[in-house]
Amino acid sequence: MPKIQLSKNFIRSTCKLALNEDLYPLGDITTNLLKNNSISKVKLISNQKGIIGGLEFAKETFNLLDKNIKFQIKKNEGSKVTRGSVIAVIEGKIKNILIGERVALNFLSHISGIATKTNKFVKKAGKKTKICCTRKTIPNLRVIQKYAVKLGGGTNHRFNLSDEYLICLLYTSDAADEVD
């Protein structure tokens, strides 16, 4: 498994955008109705087997909401998990846990889902074949999606148009004759 690291700055800025998307303009109006804000402990438990990914995004999501939240990772990024595996334990004020839980779970689900699916293809293809991803990613999620492919054992192709030349059918068709 290749060692992949995303910068802390990238993870932080991505989590800030995600939280802003969820909380703008008025915050979590439902959680704000709760009177209780006691310290609580929550376990993140896998609901199926697969490859876990996105732990640093989940951790940073809670850290941005409350620096006092403890996020204890129980499984390594890129490791196999089974249904019922404890992935992480979160301890902190319940309101902040509730505010961040959906954003954190979305990162975990998306990255783990891609890594798990990629891993299935990699196993099926065998050692002599590389499973590569393309640039056909959701805008602004390319780095995360390609990261997930690597976690699953896949290979990244081009990240952008300047990485290498790629001549596809469009360039060899009549449409290309119109371009100087």
Placement of each model-derived feature along the sequence:
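Acidic/glycine-rich phosphate/pyrophosphate-binding loops and surrounding catalytic core
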Residues: 2-173
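Single conserved hydrophobic/aromatic residue that forms the stacking wall/gate
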Residues: 174-180
